[in-house]
């Protein structure tokens, strides 16, 4: 069965560095490994804009990163699919979303599905 490892720590403490090294070591040992970040589950750019417009006086919803700015349903579907080994599509692969923070002039947007990781 799959093993899921979650890392939670403050910004700038080395999570990406640790995870990159773990991935390298696991793949070198012959294990299939996928890395994802909570950032990969931000709302799409259009959804972010709609949320900000719906709550114009809430500064926490004007930018990504705060509670309420993630697609939790997509995150749960993806994690469940990874632990089951398929995402319900006919090819039995799991598509892991990616988020492009540089899109829309730095406001960010979910990357097109063609750029998602497939395992």
Predicted regions and their residues:
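Extreme N-terminal, non-catalytic leader segments
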Residues: 1-6, 10, 31
């Amino acid at each position: 069965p799959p093993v899921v490892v979650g890392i939670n720590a403050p910004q700038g403490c080395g999570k990406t560095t640790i995870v990159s090294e773990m991935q390298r070591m696991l793949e070198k040992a012959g294990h299939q490994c996928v890395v994802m970040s909570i950032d990969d589950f931000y709302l799409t750019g259009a959804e972010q804009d709609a949320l900000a417009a719906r709550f114009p006086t809430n500064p926490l919803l004007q930018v990504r990163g705060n509670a309420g700015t993630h697609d939790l349903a997509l995150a749960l579907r993806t994690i469940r699919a990874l632990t089951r080994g398929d995402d319900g599509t006919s090819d039995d692969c799991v598509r892991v979303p990616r988020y492009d923070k540089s899109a829309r002039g730095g406001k960010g947007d979910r990357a097109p599905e063609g750029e998602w990781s497939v395992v």
